[in-house]
C-alpha cells in the first residue's frame, strides 16, 4: 500500500492488527487454566473478579459500558441463542449481555460517575421474562451529518429489528456469519480491541466536517473514504463463506464489487454523498473539461443522489445492508471464476435471507424486498472509474486500484 493510503487509514489498519487470532475459532485455547480462573461468560482467561464473578477484561468492560451508557441491544439473528465464547463473543451484544447477567454480574456494582447507581439500567428485550414477551421501539437517532473523526457511525444502528422469522439451521448460520462480519467492521478507537457494536439511548453526533468544500473538509472525505474501503475489504475477509472460496475467486469478486461495496458502506455509515463537495465540482473531477465528460459526470452525480434518497426513504436496516453487500459481492456471472456454482449458491442464500428478513421485520411492507433488490442496479450506474476518480485519486495517485485492493486484502 502506498504511503498516502497507509496514512489515510491508520485507525483501521491498527484495529485490524489488534484482532484476536481466535475470532474464527482458529486460535488455541489457554492451557493450564482451571474452571475457577476462566471467564464465566466467554471462557477466556479471567483477570479476576469483576462485578461479582470471575470474568475477562473484555466481558467486564463490555458489561460496564452497557450499564453505564444504558445501552439497548437486539439479537440481530433473532433467536436469542447466539454462541457466546472466546471466538464469538463479539457476534451478538444482546446475547453477550444476557449471558453476563445469567452468569451473575451485578449491575449495581458498576460505578457510574454521571448518575446514581439506582438509575443505571440496561434495557434489552432478550433479557425480559419469556412469559411476558414484548417489544419496545428503539429511538431513532437524528439524521447523521457524517462520520466523525472517531470513525463512521451507522445510520440505522438504533432502529428496531422486530421479530425474527423461523428459518432452517443452515440459513441461520449464514445469517449469523453476515452479522458477525458486520460486527467485526464496526470499529471505534476506544473499542478496537473488542470490536464492540453498541447503540446508545442518547447518542451525541458531532457537527459535520463536510459542510464546506474547504481543503480540510475534502481531506476528511478522502480519509474517510479510504477507511470505508478498507472496512469493505475487511468485511469480505471476515465472511467465512467468502474466505472458503478459491483465492483467485476471492480476488476476482472483490475487484468486481469494490465500488458497490464502498457505496453501500458510505450510505450505511452516513458519508454525506448527497451534499458531498466532491460531487459539487464536476469540472474538477470529471477527468477533463470536455462537454461530454461534464454531462456524464453530472448524470452519474444525479443518479447517486437519487439512489441515496431511495435508501433513506426505505430506512434500510443493518441486516438488510449485510444481505445487500453479500448480493453485490457474490456474482456468479463474473468472468474467470473457478467455482461459479458455489458463488451462485451463496448469492441465492443471500437473497433468501434478505427476503425472509424483510417479511419478518416489515410484514406490512409487501413490496419491500423487491424495492431493496431494485436499489442494487443503481449502484452500478456509477462506474467504478468514476468512484475511484472522485474519492480515491487524490489519495492513491496513479496507484492502480487493483494493487490497492490487493494490499488491503493481504494486510
Curated annotation (Swiss-Prot):
InterPro entries: NHR-like_dom_sf, Nucl_hrmn_rcpt_lig-bd, Nuclear_hormone_rcpt_NR2, Nuclear_hrmn_rcpt, Znf_hrmn_rcpt, Znf_NHR/GATA. There is a cross-link at residues 186, 331, 338 (Glycyl lysine isopeptide (Lys-Gly) (interchain with G-Cter in SUMO)). Residues 36-112 bind DNA. One of its GO terms (molecular function) is nuclear receptor activity. Coiled coil: none annotated. Its main location: nucleus. Orphan nuclear receptor of retinal photoreceptor cells. Transcriptional factor that is an activator of rod development and repressor of cone development. Binds the promoter region of a number of rod- and cone-specific genes, including rhodopsin, M- and S-opsin and rod-specific phosphodiesterase beta subunit. Enhances rhodopsin expression. Represses M- and S-cone opsin expression. This is Photoreceptor-specific nuclear receptor.
Amino acid at each position: 500500500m502506498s504511503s498516502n493510503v497507509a496514512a489515510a487509514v491508520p485507525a483501521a489498519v491498527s484495529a485490524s492488527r489488534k484482532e484476536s487470532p481466535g475470532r474464527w475459532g482458529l486460535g488455541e485455547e489457554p492451557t493450564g487454566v482451571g474452571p475457577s480462573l476462566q471467564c464465566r461468560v466467554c471462557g477466556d482467561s479471567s483477570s479476576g473478579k469483576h462485578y461479582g464473578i470471575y470474568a475477562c477484561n473484555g466481558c467486564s468492560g463490555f458489561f460496564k459500558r452497557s450499564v453505564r451508557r444504558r445501552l439497548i441491544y437486539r439479537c440481530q439473528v433473532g433467536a436469542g441463542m447466539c454462541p457466546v465464547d472466546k471466538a464469538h463473543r463479539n457476534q451478538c451484544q444482546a446475547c453477550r449481555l444476557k449471558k453476563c447477567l445469567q452468569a451473575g454480574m451485578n449491575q449495581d456494582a458498576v460505578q457510574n460517575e454521571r448518575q446514581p447507581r439506582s438509575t443505571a439500567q440496561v434495557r434489552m428485550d432478550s433479557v425480559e421474562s419469556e412469559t411476558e414477551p414484548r417489544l419496545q421501539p428503539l429511538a431513532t437517532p437524528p439524521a447523521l451529518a457524517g462520520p466523525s473523526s472517531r470513525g463512521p457511525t451507522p445510520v440505522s444502528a438504533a432502529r428496531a429489528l422486530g421479530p425474527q422469522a423461523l428459518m432452517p439451521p443452515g440459513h441461520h448460520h449464514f445469517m449469523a456469519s453476515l452479522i458477525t462480519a458486520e460486527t467485526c467492521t464496526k470499529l471505534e478507537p476506544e473499542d478496537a480491541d473488542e470490536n464492540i457494536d453498541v447503540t446508545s439511548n442518547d447518542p451525541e453526533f458531532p457537527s459535520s466536517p463536510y459542510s464546506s468544500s474547504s481543503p480540510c473538509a475534502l481531506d476528511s472525505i478522502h480519509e474517510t473514504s479510504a477507511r470505508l474501503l478498507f472496512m469493505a475489504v475487511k468485511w469480505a475477509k471476515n465472511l467465512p463463506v467468502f474466505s472458503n472460496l478459491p483465492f483467485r475467486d476471492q480476488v476476482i469478486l472483490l475487484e468486481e464489487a469494490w465500488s458497490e461495496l464502498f457505496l453501500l458502506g458510505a450510505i450505511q455509515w452516513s458519508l454525506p454523498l448527497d451534499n458531498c463537495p466532491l460531487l459539487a465540482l464536476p469540472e474538477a473531477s470529471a477527468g477533463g473539461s470536455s462537454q461530454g465528460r461534464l454531462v456524464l459526470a453530472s448524470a452519474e452525480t444525479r443518479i447517486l443522489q437519487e439512489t441515496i434518497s431511495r435508501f433513506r426513504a426505505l430506512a434500510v436496516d443493518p441486516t438488510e445492508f449485510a444481505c445487500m453487500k453479500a448480493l453485490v459481492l457474490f456474482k456468479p456471472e463474473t468472468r474467470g471464476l473457478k467455482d461459479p456454482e458455489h458463488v451462485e449458491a451463496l448469492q441465492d442464500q443471500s437473497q433468501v435471507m434478505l427476503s425472509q428478513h424483510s417479511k419478518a421485520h416489515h410484514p406490512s411492507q409487501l413490496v419491500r424486498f423487491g424495492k431493496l433488490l431494485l436499489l442494487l442496479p443503481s449502484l452500478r450506474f456509477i462506474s467504478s472509474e468514476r468512484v475511484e476518480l472522485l474519492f480515491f485519486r487524490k489519495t492513491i495517485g496513479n496507484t492502480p486500484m487493483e494493487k490497492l485492493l490487493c494490499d488491503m486484502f493481504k494486510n
